[in-house]
Regions:
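A short aromatic-anchored loop/beta-hairpin motif
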Residues: 1-106
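General beta-strand structural signal in soluble alpha/beta enzymes
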Residues: 7, 51, 115-117, 143
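Generic structural hydrophobic/aromatic packing signal, biased to beta-strands
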Residues: 7-9, 103, 129, 140-143
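Conserved ATP-utilizing enzyme core subdomain
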Residues: 109-140
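Conserved small/polar residues in nucleotide/adenosyl-binding loops
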Residues: 145-147
Length: 147
């Protein structure tokens, strides 16, 4: 039986980029929570991460904003924002094209979904991943919901 982990976390750009301005106790508690979540994820020995995040106009725009979009790539680059502003270096995270194609094929049966073979990660994905898979080495399958 597959083992699945589900979790949620904040993606505010200042979590990394302005960490020095935070109350030390609050920052330490948040970073500890990210450490706990990373440990819980790694305890499942995951083959891939499925990330659901908001799209911050990095890949889609008002004249072409799908309700739902899924990434289907061999890799994803990020962050699209200034690395100094986020305090996250540029990275390339592996994707899982086969898993993405299988999920997209099933979802398309009931949901109007767009897929993208290129996707630049913005802070909404880059910030959590910088804590949860800091080497950016776990294959990612992304989905975007317009909320």
């Amino acid at each position: 039986m597959p083992l699945v982990y589900a979790g949620v976390c904040s993606h505010a750009p200042g979590i990394r980029g302005r960490a020095d301005q935070a109350d030390p106790a609050a920052k330490d508690a948040l970073y500890a929570a990210f450490d706990d979540q990373r440990a819980a994820i790694m305890a499942t020995e995951p083959d891939a991460l499925i990330v659901i995040a908001a799209e911050h106009f990095a890949n889609f725009f008002m004249n072409n904003m799908p309700a739902f979009a899924m990434g289907m790539a061999d890799f994803y680059d990020g962050p699209i924002e200034d690395p100094e502003w986020l305090a996250i270096d540029k990275f390339r995270a592996p994707g899982n094209r086969d898993l993405s194609q299988r999920i997209i094929t099933e979802v398309m049966q009931t949901v109007d979904v767009t897929y993208a073979e290129e996707w630049l990660f913005d802070h909404g994905i880059a910030v959590p991943l910088s804590f949860l898979t800091p080497e950016f080495d776990l294959p990612i399958k992304i989905g975007r919901a317009h909320v």
